[in-house]
């Protein structure tokens, strides 16, 4: 079995377990929730199989939906994030994305931070708009997106530093 495949399997299981056991129970003031399980989609190898990523993103989201007993907004948000990932790479990294020289989990520079921030905001915006699903609640969804996005971004950056402490 390839080392990258093993790392991805362990990352999938570890992030989903951490989400289920710790982060699903954490909220700040009832507005900000943390969803670091999306790090799996963010840290998936640039040159990895895109169809497999879409399938794994759906599986990751549907597992989260099962844990929270929700109707599928996590699955939709994860699949949309996985689908938009190449566009986000092009926006954040420009031409270097084409040569697949990017490793998100090495160190956090402005390009990587921009990619992570955009990924988190897109995921959360889709998630909360699907959860609220009323025009009158759009401001509440935007507030939850902003607060949860900041919370998730901080946790994701800390997690990346904890995963690869020797490379910083």
Question: What residues fall within each predicted segment?
Answer:
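Terminal, non-globular segments
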Residues: 1-168
